[in-house]
């Protein structure tokens, strides 16, 4: 059972650092989270155990978790894992930034026919996927259709769904009245799939018209309208789509359109992407993405066979499987869902590519590479001038002081993840100043005194970074930090065997043996003079132990 921790003043649960609240539901909040190792954003639904019990919705929550764990579809919100604490459940799900389709329609009104068709095709593909996996959603509505940054639809909230069995009829009346089928509000028996078709028809109408086909503030009157099945069709609607709507909103479920009928309709087939209805129904489980597997191996410093075993084990809580699905989904999102999840290999470039990353917040250029502050000309500001050893040094630059550090051409996120892993292994304690600046201490087992140092990652040039080690004297006033208390090494819990950020790929930048000698370079940092005697030796021993651990 996981425990809540503090990270830079924010709550950390498992691998995820929680951020702002995205919304508040009946059972708790939904917050944005960030996977500490991969950097991917997720949505974390927080379910309070006591509230779940008091509202008697344990079964509803269990169904939602059970269903989402099974699903891997580009237009269904994915559940990556569930983390339990004594007080709460944390459902870690796919994050989308576009909000609800309901809010989009309220703000923009009816959608252009071509765009409405594109969204409806995505929604129906997701519903078809549910039905093929014997799951009926039963509460489809624009509020449960989310939009990502590229205006792709994602179905969410499977709490009301039932898994279908042959010959089984559902008697439960649930869902929102405006979108509910006549047989649902009448309490009649229904098989399941046909109620989702009705709801899809209401959603399509809302997309095309900007209003609902059945609406009334007086609920009995609303029910009468739904049972009568009479709704207004605007003149501007294409005749072809009007016939489709009438077929989907048939009161008699036996006469209502099926998914097969909709897929064969001429209006629906226009510009239909092939990935939405793949011919091979086994696409969602049997094809493993080799590039994603390799990326997991690099990040967690594990073998491909370990990743494959995790994927085939079927354990959704396995950290390697969770990281694999995060990588896959985010690559697909960046590709605007143009290829189906697991149907083929996504592009090899990472969404965290250096060219798109520029300088992350909190990461500073190394002072050695910063321009002198005596002129305002572009030439004086150019970092390349600082690299030119043939040029006379500006008088404004102080005499350089030696420092100890490690250079790397890995991504800054990977470097810091490796540092956290090493500190955890060494049982160091630390306080986060920002994402790339830590204050670290270690207790001398003999004297009982604490040795302190500062670790800061600097941008040396557009290709490499420098992890700087600096001694901290006890007399120095601590900088203000986002964390109120120093973090124990457990704050990096779950960073299981990340890839070494200092693997040898170039002679100067990645060799640790070369780093110790090559990184004794000039720095304009105003370092604190360490205390004489044992403190200096303790500091260097602390540096040596960290460097040795990073080299493993």
Curated annotation (Swiss-Prot):
Biased composition (Low complexity): 511-521
Regulation of its activity: Activated by phosphorylation on Thr-172. Binding of AMP to non-catalytic gamma subunit (PRKAG1, PRKAG2 or PRKAG3) results in allosteric activation, inducing phosphorylation on Thr-172. AMP-binding to gamma subunit also sustains activity by preventing dephosphorylation of Thr-172. ADP also stimulates Thr-172 phosphorylation, without stimulating already phosphorylated AMPK. ATP promotes dephosphorylation of Thr-172, rendering the enzyme inactive. Under physiological conditions AMPK mainly exists in its inactive form in complex with ATP, which is much more abundant than AMP.
Keywords in alphabetical order: ATP-binding, Autophagy, Biological rhythms, Cholesterol biosynthesis, Cholesterol metabolism, Chromatin regulator, Cytoplasm, Fatty acid biosynthesis, Fatty acid metabolism, Kinase, Lipid biosynthesis, Lipid metabolism, Magnesium, Metal-binding, Nucleotide-binding, Nucleus, Phosphoprotein, Serine/threonine-protein kinase, Steroid biosynthesis, Steroid metabolism, Sterol biosynthesis, Sterol metabolism, Transcription, Transcription regulation, Transferase, Ubl conjugation, Wnt signaling pathway
Residues where ATP binds: 22-30, 45
EC class of the enzyme, as a word: transferase
Family: Belongs to the protein kinase superfamily. CAMK Ser/Thr protein kinase family. SNF1 subfamily.
UniProt protein name: 5'-AMP-activated protein kinase catalytic subunit alpha-2
Native source organism of the sequence: Pongo abelii
Gene name in the database record: PRKAA2
